[in-house]
Amino acid sequence: MTETTKVMYIVVVDGTDTAETVEEDGTGTWKDSFRYTRPVLQSTLQLMGCKARHAFKISRRVFELIRSEGSLILSPSLSPSHSKESEFQKTGDASACANVEKANKVNSLATDDVDKSKSKPFEVYKRRTTVVVSREIFVNVVCDALAEYKYVGHDQRADLILSCRIRERKESVTVLLCGTSGCGKSTLSALLGSRLGITTVVSTDSIRHMMRSFVDEKQNPLLWASTYHAGEYLDPVAVAESKARRRRAKKMDSIEDEKAKASEGGKAKNTQQTDVGSTKNTPVLLSPKQMAVEGFKAQSEMVIDNLDRLITAWEERKESVIVEGVHLSLNFVMGLMKKHPSIVPFMVYIANEEKHLERFAVRAKYMTLDPEKNKYVKYIRNIRTIQDYLCKRADKHLVPKINNTNVDKSVAAIHATVFSCLRRREAGEHLYDATTNTVSVIDDEYRNQCTANSLSSKGMFQLIQRKGSSRHLMALLNTDGTFARTWPVTGKVDESGKPVFCNEMIEENGMEHPVYGYLQKAEPVNLQFGLFGISAWPSDGATSRAGSVDDCKADMAETSSRYYSSCCSSPRMSEGTSKELKEDQSVHGSDEEVEDDPPEPDTDFSDDDNKRDHDEVGSVDEQSTKSDEEYDDLAMEDKSYWTDEEEESRDTIAIMSEKNNKQATKEDKYIQNLDLFLRTANQQLVEPLQLCASLLTCENGNTRLWLGKEKMRKRSLSISAIGKHGSGLGDAILLGAP
């Protein structure tokens, strides 16, 4: 077998018999195949949740494995870390080996036809540097390369296949980023496109600009206006009359329903007709805020029709795209989702009005917030009113809302949610529920991602194995060294290639084996999508100890903040169960949404009502998760609350903490972890003392006893220490295991 000197392309052929599909069709490509380069493979790995630097290294490793010994087909192992036999050596499939020989002949024929193809030098180079492999071999090699970099996933093989289908344009996804002006949609879409590997990013402003080239400003001033002051170009009387007619039509419909249900429907009809007649000639003019929303809706309706045609063309070509813009009103988006199953919408907003206002300073010509020189500041009331309207519509339709105060976490949350929705769509679920006119599936996935991020932010993940057991577990470690939660992990797969998870918890003698028992092995691992990736794992239901009071309060605060809207006082969970049936199935929105005067933006977005909205999305406000002991700690910071003995012990701890920060030795890491461990001394611990024995070791090697009444000065001191020396915890667990 001739060894390929350089591999630039990997042609992945569908099917097991590569001899039939390797035949060239005259265009220099193979039928039913896809050509992967290193950047394309790297983008595919990033789409399935790998970090960018890991995706770069894994793609390079895959090409090295494919290159070595003729795509590594006849090598004794695919992965040094697993010592796994080759698929062909393990099964002894002679026909598969014959297919590989035929595929290699295609590569060798390229060198024989050099003289015939001198007019196409690039085609010759491409054939010389191309290796043809089957889909199964390609997936196996990539999965083994992922295992070398300690990537563990619930269904990693299925995620890789799904990511390949998106990259090969066998499936597509359309991400919609809704939101008003100044909330960071353009920046978010650019970063998200880079993360997902989507090169088509379209703004609705560009669609509006294209439409303006076909009509003069005098002919259609509404189209030439900005969304936040488009209401100025509407006739208030005409708008009021139109809304009055719609209200009368709804009342007539309700009268007909009452007449059909009750025998006294005629009397009710007469009373309703008198009410309608009394307001027929006196339409009530709308407020300026309602006119701003009506102008926004009118311009959005013009843009959304052209966007509908574009999405139809993209879906026919299986092209993934990201669309962002203020014209993506949620009632219009629901109409689009009924026609286009590839849409995944998100609502981007800024809860803090001051931060929202600061974003407009960079858009002004003179970097100022002067309303005379900055039009965004001048119309900030209308912008906030439109955002309030969009947020309420998002709550009604259960569209996930992203408080875009931290761009990195916003991108990570959207990325993980989009891929989770693709998994469920691949399983046959519909993202849009036409009965309730909601997207509860997307909302559930987003909440799962937020819950997973909140859970995993309290510790670190390690792959553990109990002593005397062959079962591997994914464990979430608390900062004190105990296990908060575990998930089963196994390398076995079924006939379809999906992993088989073991759930046995009983030993041979019938005694239950504790999860928190003695450890035989513990090593850190990488999860797809980072902290958000644990949401895809099935819960094992086994924990070593109950969570601490602080952890419970943090989880409660985080969960409650996700279920409540930042723009509406009613819970989102209750709205999902009592959602009324959809009345209008067209792309146009319903008309009852602005019957009442929208509330002041200041009341909906005030800092007092939204203290749970932190600068970092997914984190919990520290002030809302403090236990009684922590408040006592803060109160004791004042010298008037300290006794002489406590003052002396506090100074001793302060000096020791400063010394630890300077030296940063391994023993100091254990002492700092011990300080945090003693904070939960009053809680019931079932973890063996051997697990944390190394944490009690000080510089001279002796065991040091601490009094529970000695408090730390600040919570942030221990957290920052662990953040700098996080590896010390893993060493402590390994030393604690017999």
From Swiss-Prot:
Residues 251-267, 577-591, 608-628 have a biased composition (Basic and acidic residues). Disruption phenotype: Strong reduction in seed phytic acid with a molar equivalent increase in inorganic phosphate. Residues 270-283 have a biased composition (Polar residues). InterPro entries: P-loop_NTPase. Residues 564-574 have a biased composition (Low complexity). Required for the accumulation of phytic acid in seeds. Phytic acid is the primary storage form of phosphorus in cereal grains and other plant seeds. This is P-loop NTPase domain-containing protein LPA1 homolog 1. One of its GO terms (biological process) is myo-inositol hexakisphosphate biosynthetic process. Residues 245-283, 564-646 are annotated as: Disordered. Signal peptide: none annotated. It comes from the Eukaryota.
